[in-house]
C-alpha cells in the first residue's frame, strides 16, 4: 500500500500535537511520508455487500474455494460469489440486491447441461435427463431380440401435464451394418421400450482368413454397441422421422442445444451367443443326500411343471421315502423313474380336500450300483405337476417337501414355489425419480425421501406398474433405507456414511433387479468460518443498553460514567459467521476411495440448513443474530456450536474471544451505488459450479437520479467489516455534499441510509459521510462523530448503455487509460500542496471519540488489491468511464479535497475528542498562548529600545544602547577586569543580523559557579560618532531599585563580519545580581564608567 502525502506511522501518534505547536509558534514543517507496504486488512478484504439469492431452484448452495484468489473480492464496487445448482425443475435465476436496487440473471443452459440432457427448455422442463436400461445383455440366436427401456429422470411424477414427449431412435452397429428401433416416451413416469432384432449373420463368428483356423466362440460372446438419439415426433405423435444421425456422429457434438440432442448417445454393450443356455433351474436341498430341481421361469395355466429328484453321487442311502404336498389348483401327476435299472419307485397319492399329498418310495436296485459320471448328482425320478387353476393372474403355488429314511426318521420340511403368470415377463426395472440423494437429514433432522416405482416388461414390450407386488431390501441401511411398502427410499439422519451406487434390491416372483442410488453425506466435523474471532469494544461508540445489551463488566470509577452513563455502554465488534462442509461419498470399490460432490477444493455454505441448531456455549458473552452475525456482549471466551438435531453430539464448534481491549474506528470506506448489474461465468475447474460477479453502478446518468451509499469500517486491530451487519439503531449516517451544483443530499427517509441526488454533471470526491453514535447516547450537544468517509461521485447525463457497448470492445485498454487519467488528475490536485503534512491517526493511537479537525488521509488497499480495480477501490471492468468528458472541478474546497484523493478506499477518519483530550489540549493551548504573549511582549520591548544609544563623556553618541544582563556582583566585575582579549575557546553566537551602523555580537555564557574572569571588549567602528542618539531615561544613583536584582530582555543586532563591539560575560557570583551597561551612566560604578571612557578614548 502506497500513500503520498501521508505522515509516517511513527509520526502519526504526535501528529495533532505537532500541528498545534507548528501553528502557534509559527514554525513550518516540511514532511513527506510513505506508508510502509503492509497489508492493512488482516481479515477478509472489503467488497460490495450485496445479497445473492438463487430463485427457481429446489436445492442450491453458495460455495467457498479452498484457496481463493485474494483479488476476487477486493473492491468496494463489486462482489464475486460462486454457487452450485444441485436440483432444479426449470432454469434458475440469480438475484442480487442491495437496498432498493436489484438485478436478475437467468443461468444459461450451457453452464448447467449434463451429458444426458433431454432437449431444449422451450419444449421440455429444465432438469429432465434420460436413463436407459438394457433388458437383455445376453442375446441368443434362438431369440435374437433386444429390448431397451428409457426413463426420464428428474420428472415430477405427480405433475400430469400432457407434454409432447420426444421420440427415441435406437441403433446397433456391427460390421458396417446397423439395426434400428424406436419408441416414444409417455405415461406419468415418462417410459418407453425400444425393441431391436439382431441380424442372424451377427451371431456367426468373424470371417476366417484363408490359411488360419476358425476361432472358437468366445465365452463372453460377440460385442455389439447400442446408441440412441432424441428426435421430435410428428404432428400425430408418430416416430417416423428420417435419419437423425448427422455426419455419422457417434459421440455428442457441440452444435448447440437444438442440434446436440440429435447426435448419438451411447447406451451400452450387449453380447451375442449362438448356443442357448440350458434351462435355468432352482435348487432345493432337503438334506445332504436328496436335492430337488425346479424350473425358475414362470408358468402359465395348464402347463406341466417337472421336478427333478436327484441324489448325491457320494451318498450311501439305498432307501428313502419322498413326500410332497400341494394346494388346491395343482394336480400331482405320475412319477417317472430316470434309471429303472438303478431305482425302484412306488407312488401313493392322497386327497385331503384343500391339499393333495403324494408319497414316493425309492429303493436302490443292487448293492454296488453307483453312478460314476462326473456330475455331483444323479437323477432318481421326475415328478410332474399340472397347473390347473389359480386365483390371480400372477402368483405362486407352494410345494412342501420332506424326505424320510427307514430307522432314521424324517427331515425338516422344505418349501419350493412355482411362479404362475399369464404374461411372458422379461424383466422388472426399479425406477427412482433421481439417481442421487443428498443426505441433509444429518444437518436438519428432516427425512429426505425419493419416490420409487417398479415396472415389469413383457415379451411384447408391455409395461406394467407392479410397485405394490414387489419385495425390497437395502443392502446397507447405514447408507440408505427403503420403506416397508417399497414405494420410496430415504435417509433419516441416522446414517453414518455415503456411498456411490448403493444398492436396494427389488424382487418380483422369480425376477429381481437392483436400484443404484448415490448417497452424498456432509463431511464431519463441519467447518465454522468467523470473519473475526477476537471481538473488542469500540472506543467512542456507545449504544443504548437493552435486554440483549447489558453492560459488559464493572468499570473503573473514571470509566463508569462513560460506560454506563445515560443508559449506554460501549459497542462490541461484530463478525460474520457461516458454516461450511463438503458432501462426500465412498467409492464402490474395495478400497472405498472418497469422492466429492464437486471437488476437494470447494466447500458448501450450509448455514441456512443448520441455523436452527447453532448456539453459543455462553450466550452472555456473545450472541448470534440471524445465525450469521456474531455480537460480543461481555469479556470472556465462548464457543460457537452446531448441534446434531437427532442426538447430543456436536457437529462443529469454533472458539471466539471477547477481549477487554478497546479498538477505534480508523477508516470508513464509502461507495456510491446507483444501480446493480450481474454477470455469470463458468468455473473452468468444475463445470457444475458457476461464478457470479455483482457490480455497483456509480455513475448517475440522469438529473435527479438517486443513489445510496455502501460503507465499510476498519478498526485499529486491522479487521474490516461492512456497516450493514450492525444494528441500524446504534448509529446514524449523515451525508454532506461538497459541491451542491453536482450532487445534493435530500432529506433522508431513514437516518441510517442517506441518499444522493444528481444535480449537474461533474465527478470527483464530492460526498462526505459522517458516522455518529445513536442520539440516545450523545453525552452533550456536541455530536459524537465516530468516522468520516469521502465518496467519489460521477454524474454525466446522456451516458447510456449504448455508449457502454461501443467502448466494450476495448475493455482492457479503456480500464488502463481511465485509471491513468484519474491518477493524473489526482496528482494535479495534489501538486499545489505536496509539501504540506497531512496528519492522520494510526490505528491504536486514537482515543475514544477522538475527532481530528482536519480531513484525514485515506488508506488504500495494498498494491495487489489495486490491480483488480481502481485506486479508489471501485472496479472499472463493466463501466469504462472517460473522466476527461466531465466538467472540471477547480473550485472544490481544497482542505476537503486533499484528504480524498484516493476516492472510496478505506480512509483514516476523524473522531470526536474525549473529555480528557479536550482538557489536555486546552491546557496546551493556554500554555502556548502564554508563550506567544510573552514573546510578543519581548518583541515589543526590543523594538522600543532598538535605536536607543547611550551618550558617553567625550563622545557625541553611540549607535545602540547595550542592554546587557550581568549575572554577577559589582565586586567580582571590578576584580576580574584584566586582559581585554577573549579566550581562544570562546565563540560568538549570531542571534540577529542587521545592516548599517555599529552592530554588536553578544555571547552570554551562563556558568554560575565558574571562576573565569569577566572580559569585555568594546570597539567603536569608524564614523559611528556622527549618529544621532536618543536621550536616555535617567534614574537616580541612589534609587532603591538600583540594588535589586533585575532581568531585562532586549533585542540585539548583528554587525558585519569586520570588527565590532563584543561583550563576553561570565557569571561569577550569585549574590547581588546587577544591571550592567544599561545606560553606562546610570546604575554603574564610577570606576567602570571611567574605565570605559578611557577605553573609548584610546580607540
UniProtKB/Swiss-Prot annotation:
Glycans are attached at residues 95, 314, 371. Residues 32-915 are extracellular. The keyword Glycoprotein applies. InterPro entries: Ig_TMEM132_2nd, Ig_TMEM132_5th, Ig_TMEM132_6th, TMEM132, TMEM132_3rd, TMEM132_C, TMEM132_M, TMEM132_N. One of its GO terms (biological process) is negative regulation of phosphatase activity. It is found in: Membrane. Residues 1008-1018 have a biased composition (Polar residues). Keywords: Glycoprotein, Membrane, Signal, Transmembrane, Transmembrane helix. Residues 937-1099 are cytoplasmic. Residues 813-849 have a biased composition (Basic and acidic residues). GO terms for cellular component: membrane. Its main location: membrane. Residues 237-260, 801-872, 1002-1045 are annotated as: Disordered. It is a single-pass type I membrane protein. The chain crosses the membrane at residues 916-936. Residues 1-31 form the signal peptide. Belongs to the TMEM132 family. This is Transmembrane protein 132C. It comes from Mus musculus (Mouse). The gene is Tmem132c.
Amino acid at each position: 500500500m502506497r500513500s503520498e502525502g501521508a505522515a509516517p506511522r511513527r509520526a502519526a501518534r504526535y501528529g495533532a500535537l505537532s500541528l498545534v505547536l507548528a501553528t502557534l509558534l509559527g514554525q513550518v514543517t516540511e514532511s513527506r511520508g510513505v506508508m510502509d507496504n503492509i497489508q492493512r486488512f488482516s481479515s477478509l478484504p472489503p467488497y460490495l455487500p450485496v445479497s445473492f439469492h438463487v430463485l427457481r431452484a429446489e436445492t442450491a448452495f453458495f460455495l467457498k474455494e479452498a484457496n481463493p484468489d485474494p483479488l476476487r473480492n477486493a473492491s468496494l464496487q463489486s462482489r464475486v460469489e460462486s454457487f452450485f445448482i444441485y436440483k432444479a425443475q426449470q432454469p434458475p435465476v440469480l438475484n442480487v440486491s442491495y437496498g432498493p436496487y436489484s438485478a436478475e440473471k437467468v443461468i444459461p443452459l450451457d453452464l448447467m447441461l449434463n451429458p444426458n440432457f433431454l432437449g431444449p427448455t422451450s419444449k421440455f422442463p429444465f432438469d429432465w435427463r434420460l436413463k436407459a436400461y438394457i433388458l437383455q445383455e445376453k442375446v441368443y440366436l434362438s431369440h435374437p431380440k433386444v429390448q431397451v427401456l428409457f426413463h426420464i429422470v428428474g420428472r415430477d411424477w405427480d405433475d400430469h401435464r400432457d407434454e409432447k414427449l420426444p421420440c427415441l431412435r435406437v441403433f446397433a452397429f456391427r460390421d458396417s451394418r446397423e439395426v434400428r428401433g424406436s419408441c416414444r416416451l409417455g405415461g406419468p413416469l415418462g417410459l418407453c421400450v425400444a425393441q431391436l432384432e439382431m441380424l442372424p449373420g451377427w451371431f456367426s463368428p468373424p470371417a476366417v482368413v484363408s490359411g488360419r483356423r476358425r476361432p472358437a466362440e468366445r465365452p463372453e460372446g460377440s460385442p455389439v454397441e447400442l446408441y440412441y438419439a432424441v428426435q421430435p415426433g410428428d404432428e400425430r405423435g408418430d416416430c417416423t422421422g428420417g435419419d437423425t444421425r448427422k455426419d455419422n456422429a457417434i459421440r455428442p457434438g457441440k452444435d448447440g442445444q437444438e442440434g446436440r440432442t440429435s447426435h448419438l448417445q451411447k447406451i451400452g454393450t450387449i453380447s451375442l451367443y449362438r448356443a442357448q443356455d440350458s434351462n435355468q433351474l432352482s435348487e432345493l436341498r432337503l438334506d445332504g443326500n436328496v436335492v430337488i430341481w425346479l424350473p425358475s421361469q414362470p408358468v402359465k395355466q395348464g402347463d406341466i411343471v417337472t421336478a427333478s429328484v436327484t441324489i448325491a453321487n457320494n451318498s450311501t442311502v439305498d432307501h428313502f421315502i419322498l413326500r410332497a404336498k400341494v394346494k388346491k389348483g395343482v394336480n400331482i401327476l405320475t412319477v417317472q423313474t430316470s434309471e429303472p435299472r438303478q431305482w425302484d419307485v412306488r407312488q401313493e397319492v392322497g386327497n385331503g380336500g384343500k391339499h393333495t399329498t403324494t408319497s414316493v418310495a425309492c429303493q436302490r436296485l443292487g448293492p454296488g450300483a453307483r453312478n460314476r459320471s462326473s456330475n455331483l448328482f444323479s437323477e432318481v425320478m421326475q415328478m410332474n405337476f399340472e397347473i390347473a387353476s389359480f386365483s390371480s393372474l400372477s402368483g405362486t403355488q407352494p410345494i412342501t417337501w420332506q424326505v424320510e429314511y427307514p430307522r432314521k426318521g424324517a427331515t425338516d420340511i422344505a418349501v419350493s414355489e412355482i411362479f404362475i403368470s399369464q404374461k411372458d415377463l422379461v424383466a422388472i426395472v426399479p425406477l427412482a425419480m433421481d439417481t442421487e440423494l443428498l443426505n441433509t437429514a444429518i444437518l436438519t433432522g428432516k427425512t429426505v425421501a425419493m419416490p420409487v416405482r417398479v415396472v415389469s416388461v413383457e415379451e411384447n414390450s408391455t409395461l406394467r406398474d407392479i410397485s405394490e407386488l414387489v419385495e425390497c431390501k437395502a443392502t446397507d441401511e447405514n447408507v440408505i433405507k427403503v420403506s416397508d411398502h417399497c414405494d420410496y427410499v430415504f435417509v433419516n439422519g441416522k446414517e453414518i456414511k455415503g456411498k456411490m451406487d448403493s444398492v436396494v434390491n427389488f424382487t418380483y416372483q422369480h425376477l429381481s433387479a437392483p436400484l443404484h442410488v448415490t448417497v452424498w453425506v456432509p463431511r464431519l466435523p463441519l467447518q465454522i468460518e468467523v470473519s473475526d474471532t477476537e471481538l473488542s469494544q469500540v472506543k467512542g461508540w456507545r449504544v443504548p443498553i437493552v435486554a440483549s445489551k447489558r453492560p459488559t463488566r464493572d468499570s473503573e470509577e473514571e470509566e463508569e460514567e462513560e460506560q454506563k452513563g445515560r443508559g449506554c455502554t460501549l459497542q462490541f465488534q461484530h463478525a460474520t459467521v457461516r458454516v461450511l462442509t463438503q458432501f462426500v461419498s465412498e467409492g464402490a470399490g474395495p478400497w472405498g476411495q472418497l469422492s466429492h460432490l464437486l471437488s476437494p477444493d470447494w466447500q458448501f455454505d450450509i448455514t441456512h440448513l443448520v441455523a436452527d441448531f447453532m448456539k453459543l456455549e455462553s450466550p452472555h458473552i456473545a450472541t448470534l443474530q440471524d445465525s450469521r452475525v456474531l455480537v460480543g456482549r461481555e469479556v470472556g471466551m465462548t464457543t460457537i456450536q452446531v448441534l446434531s438435531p437427532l442426538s447430543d453430539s456436536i457437529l462443529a464448534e469454533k472458539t471466539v474471544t471477547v477481549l477487554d481491549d478497546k479498538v477505534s474506528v480508523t477508516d470508513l470506506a464509502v461507495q456510491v451505488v446507483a444501480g446493480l448489474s450481474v454477470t455469470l461465468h463458468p468455473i473452468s475447474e468444475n463445470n457444475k459450479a458457476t461464478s457470479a460477479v455483482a457490480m455497483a453502478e456509480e455513475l448517475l446518468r440522469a438529473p435527479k437520479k438517486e443513489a445510496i451509499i455502501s460503507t465499510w469500517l476498519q478498526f485499529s486491530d486491522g479487521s474490516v467489516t461492512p456497516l450493514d451487519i450492525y444494528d441500524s439503531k446504534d448509529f446514524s449516517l449523515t451525508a454532506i455534499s461538497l459541491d451542491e451544483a453536482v450532487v445534493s443530499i435530500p432529506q433522508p427517509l431513514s437516518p441510517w441510509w442517506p441518499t444522493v441526488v444528481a444535480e449537474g454533471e461533474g465527478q470527483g470526491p464530492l460526498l462526505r459521510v459522517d458516522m455518529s453514535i445513536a442520539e440516545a447516547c450523545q453525552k452533550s450537544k456536541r455530536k459524537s462523530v465516530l468516522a468520516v468517509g469521502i465518496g467519489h461521485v460521477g454524474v454525466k447525463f446522456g451516458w447510456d448503455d449504448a455508449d457502454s457497448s461501443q467502448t466494450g470492445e476495448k475493455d482492457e485498454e479503456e480500464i488502463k487509460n481511465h485509471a491513468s487519467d484519474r491518477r493524473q488528475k489526482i496528482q494535479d490536485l495534489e501538486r499545489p500542496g505536496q509539501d504540506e503534512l497531512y496528519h492522520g491517526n494510526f490505528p491504536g493511537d486514537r482515543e475514544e471519540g477522538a475527532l481530528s479537525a482536519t480531513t484525514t488521509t485515506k488508506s488504500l488497499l495494498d498494491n495487489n488489491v489495486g490491480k483488480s480495480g481502481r485506486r479508489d477501490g471501485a472496479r472499472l471492468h463493466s463501466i469504462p468511464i472517460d473522466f476527461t468528458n466531465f466538467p472540471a472541478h477547480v473550485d472544490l474546497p481544497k482542505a476537503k479535497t486533499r484528504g480524498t484523493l484516493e476516492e472510496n478506499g478505506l480512509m483514516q477518519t476523524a473522531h470526536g475528542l474525549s473529555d480528557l483530550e479536550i482538557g489536555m489540549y486546552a491546557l496546551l493551548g493556554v500554555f502556548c498562548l502564554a508563550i506567544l504573549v510573552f514573546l510578543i511582549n519581548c518583541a515589543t520591548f526590543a523594538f522600543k529600545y532598538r535605536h536607543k544609544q547611550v551618550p558617553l563623556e567625550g563622545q557625541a553618541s553611540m549607535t545602540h544602547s547595550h542592554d546587557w544582563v550581568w549575572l554577577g556582583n559589582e565586586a567580582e566585575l571590578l576584580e576580574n577586569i584584566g586582559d581585554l582579549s577573549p579566550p581562544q575557546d570562546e565563540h560568538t553566537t549570531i542571534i540577529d543580523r542587521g545592516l548599517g551602523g555599529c552592530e554588536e555580537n553578544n555571547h552570554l555564557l551562563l556558568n554560575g559557579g565558574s571562576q573565569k574572569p569577566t572580559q569585555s571588549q568594546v570597539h567603536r567602528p569608524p564614523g559611528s560618532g556622527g549618529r544621532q542618539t536618543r536621550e536616555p531615561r535617567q534614574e537616580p544613583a541612589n534609587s532603591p531599585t538600583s540594588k535589586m536584582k533585575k532581568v531585562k530582555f532586549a533585542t540585539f543586532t548583528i554587525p558585519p563580519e569586520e570588527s565590532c563591539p563584543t561583550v563576553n560575560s561570565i557569571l561569577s557570583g550569585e549574590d547581588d545580581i546587577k544591571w550592567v551597561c544599561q545606560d553606562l551612566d546610570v546604575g554603574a560604578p564610577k570606576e567602570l564608567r571611567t574605565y570605559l571612557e578611557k577605553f573609548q578614548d584610546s580607540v
